[in-house]
Amino acid sequence: MPESSGLRGTAPRDVPGRPVGEAEARRIAVRSQLLDGTATDVLTTVRRLGFLQLDPIATVAPAQHVVLWSRLGRYDVAELDRLCWEARSLFEWDAFLWPIEQLPLVRGFMRRWRRSSHYKAERWVRDFLTENRAFRRYVLQELERRGPLLSRELEDRSLGEKEERRWYGSRNVGLMLTSLHLRGEVAIAGRRGGQRLWDLSERVLPETQALTTREAERRQRDARFRALGVRVRAGGWEAHPEAVDGDVPDRVTLLSPFDRLIHDRDRAEALFGFHYRLEMFVPNAKRVYGYYVLPILRGTSIIGRIEPVFHRKRGVLRVEGAWAEPTAPADSGPGVRDAVDRLAEWLGAESVEVGPTVPRAWSKALRG
């Protein structure tokens, strides 16, 4: 893949920011992430965020869908699939959905996987492909001849996986496809029954120039800064030069654990005073809150957390617990209940149940 012209030599410096106070930083962060109620449609939202992280855990709904719901409210989840697999306005790479305009940048990251051995995972992929050249040829030939294919439609012709390299499941066909995917040789062409369909990249992704790895990394830093709105600098905050301050309504919504507003836990604590950890891998007896707890955003403040569980067979959204932050306004209960009701409606739940663990100040509103 050719490098973009004019990108050799010294890469441009990172975009400078402007100093802002903490209150303005919070407003800009919420507005930049479209959590102020201004999001309009799925594609524009993904473009503004830069990417969507994929996670299949569906205690409520998959993370990518909850992230969009937090901004858009009720929306048709089929629209995301349409944008990916029909309109091809989005593409999937490395467990993220990217706007197609970002393909030159992502190809710079693919180049790094092909050329670099700096990180352990990069060395693992290089060694795995070197040891399994014949297996690699077989997979690429089968995709060329019969693709797109599910991973189970390919034979495991590997030499075996060394225990110390166990990295991505236990099936070597999946390991091979993932390795080739990271390097840009194969791509995800769609889904069948929730499973990925694999094909040769040239049959899925359009021809584009590839950025150098260095330029891709620089542009991604700038894109992340723009999407987040603010970053920490020298003990304070600075805003992206394109970020605009403004009022944020007291809109209440629930956030996925993978939401970019709180994905960096240290940043979330510094900006919102909110200490948050996902506890699904913590033994039940050691959990402080619950298995899959969602932060509650009200305006520019994170006022608490809540553990909703969608019981699909029963058609019930159950709130296993809710916890208010010490600074949460006493009148927050109705807004939290409204957010839960909106979530239930979007999920298609027929009713809402509330468990015993809720803040006293919110109890009447949450219990209806």
What role is predicted for each listed range?
Residues 1-368:
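Long, charged, low-complexity, helical-prone intrinsically disordered regions
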